[in-house]
Amino acid sequence: MASEFDNIVVTGLASISAAGVGLEPLREALSDGVSRLTAVPEEVLGETGHFWGKANAFRAADFMPPLKARKFDRASLFAVVATGMALKSAGIDPGGFDPARTGIMLGCGFGGIANSEEFLREYFTKGSDGLIPMLFPNTVPNAPASNASIEHDLKGPNVTFVQRFCSAESALFMAIHILEEGRADAMVVGGVDELNPAQMRGFMSMGQLSRYAGGFGEGAGLLVLERADHARRRGARILAGVGGRRTVGLLVPGAEREGVARLLDGEPAAELVSLSGTAADVAPLVERLSGIPRLETAPLTGRSLAMGGLALVAHLLSLTGGAHGLHLAASPEGPYYAFRFRGGDPAQS
């Protein structure tokens, strides 16, 4: 009998984070529960006591010639490399898929912020004569998805979302919709962010380092979603089925429980819950999760605007076959998302 998890499935995963490059370092961090954050050097902020989740194990030269790597910003490097890893995880070989039916949707917080800083610094100090045209393409938030699509020949739908702490979830929400409509057979989806000293100084001046004292991070967390019939035709290994999804906007003060009810009421019980963004700070949400094993990646690898990508990868790595999982994401001003997954191949559950 068909279920809600039979239409869209997950066939590939990829992770780059402070835990390391690839799925195994993230799996190890989830298993031992030890934070991979490191101390921010004193010269960055002028004081000690702060931590960040830098992806220090990532070396672009491990994946491409140095001259080629120079044309990308750091966020695009994460996206290009992680997309290749995700496609390989899904068993999708280069040239072995229909480019027009394969797309990419990413959440991204700041894009190539280091490139933007350099581009604007030259402009402000030297005027228009100081502008470096080669830098500009990597200053926009959609550069990572665009560069990944060019490198991997993904000619299907290509959209980037910048929506505070729910950027990756917004991408996931739309990617599922695209697949359901039949506009693509497969989608690479998730989140990517870079982190540099200028950002940290900006966060400090805005009071964000005290508000989110756990530490900010960088990296990429990507999933490959496919229409189930397409995945089965090519004999893909199915990691999980994608079930229902819901979203609500801003939780009105005094009516938070009503909003949470719209998000969660009537849904089957979950055996694992992952939290992203500021979901752990929403008291009515946390109350509803009492007694359910809970997973958060922010304390392990750091927080970013597209942290939901890594949280989703961690969720699916932790979800056993046949188990029901719930992923929740929130931003202080909304939106709020709830996604349902079922571990393993739904047809075999």
Predicted feature residues:
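Short, well-ordered, mixed-charge alpha-helical segments that flank or form enzyme active sites
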Residues: 112-115, 169-171, 195-199, 251-252
